[in-house]
Curated annotation (Swiss-Prot):
One of its GO terms (biological process) is RNA catabolic process. Pfam families: DEAD (PF00270), Helicase_C (PF00271). Residues 392-428 are annotated as: Disordered. This is ATP-dependent RNA helicase RhlB. The gene is rhlB. Keywords: ATP-binding, Cytoplasm, Helicase, Hydrolase, Nucleotide-binding, RNA-binding. The lineage of its organism: Bacteria, Pseudomonadati, Pseudomonadota, Gammaproteobacteria, Enterobacterales.
Amino acid sequence: MSKTHLTEQKFSDFALHPLVLEALEKKGFQHCTPIQALALPLTLSGRDVAGQAQTGTGKTLAFLTSTFHYLLSHPAKQDRKINQPRALIMAPTRELAVQIHSDAEALSQSTGLKMGLAYGGDGYDKQLKVLESGVDILVGTTGRLIDYAKQNYIDLGAIQVVVLDEADRMYDLGFIKDIRWLFRRMPAVDQRLNMLFSATLSYRVRELAFEQMNNAEYVEVEPEQKTGHRIKEELFYPSNEEKMRLLQTLIEEEWPDRCIIFANTKHRCEDVWGHLAADGHRVGLLTGDVAQKKRLRILDDFTKGNLDILVATDVAARGLHIPLVTHVFNYDLPDDCEDYVHRIGRTGRAGESGHSISLACEEYALNLPAIETYTGHSIPVSKYNSDALLSDLPAPKRLARPRGGNGPRRNSAPRRGGAPRNNRKRSG
């Protein structure tokens, strides 16, 4: 983590519970990010916090540190039952819930507090088995949480800490009624510590904070610019016919260590995946059609470096905490201006630099003016030589769709260390 991303404030300066401080030190966390430096003094004194911060600013560690400290510093409800968690962390997507749970593991191991995870689409019985043994902190998505609550597998009557992550995204996905349903089953707002984090503190988010929090303090960490000053942005204007060849040429020239390629539809993502897989790249595909177990496996492989490239729809544009993404390619310019910001925000995180490359083709170039108006700046344009683009590329792989599942049967062969591409040449 770059020191330029951190403040002079140290975790050890706070009166944190010794077990929490020990866990942070073991993970190498010494100095706070701006959102941590602003939020922790409030939460450690028992004040509710509504924080505005983009992903990659350290907000997850801010609310996890606060949650673990509070539970270790305050006794559980005396007549608490085994199906009553003490803290609830709500996330808009299963990927984000899994990531939060993973980030909390180090704190859990050092403190002895038990973690639970609840998300839809997969693992119902496995998740339930953990819950039945009793958990202190439950991370989940609203649909699965409501399912378990209605069947009395969980009871929210002993909640002492509640966190709502990416509150604006909750609204976008239509989950606000679910959130209110869950809040109604918790103790009163003044009997729990409440934290809310959002990329924007819009009127509707502030309204939710007013309803469900106890005189929350608002803290805001604005990026120096919406797209991040550490991200180098670049724009090309390819024809539809040259778009794929340009992408593959740029990948060969940049040779990114870890990159995400975004397209606007699942069919376009499948097409991009097919071309890159056929060309020998280690590439994974992440769309809404990919089964949950496979989604998690692909994300794990990408995070561990077993895959170099992830092709994704906007399902992966927000909430995923994947470190060291060096490049983001917008194969399609998004229709939503905010999606552009969230896409390229996958790189240049935690003080690192990043590179964003967008292809403004004939189909989506009309989206560019709105994006540049929203970000407040023009994206630098680069030119390319059509004669220098790669040619003689192999025919794309097609997705095998076995009975009962979708998505590729396996990821492509390793990109590095494989057979040489003797038939590769540039046109012209």
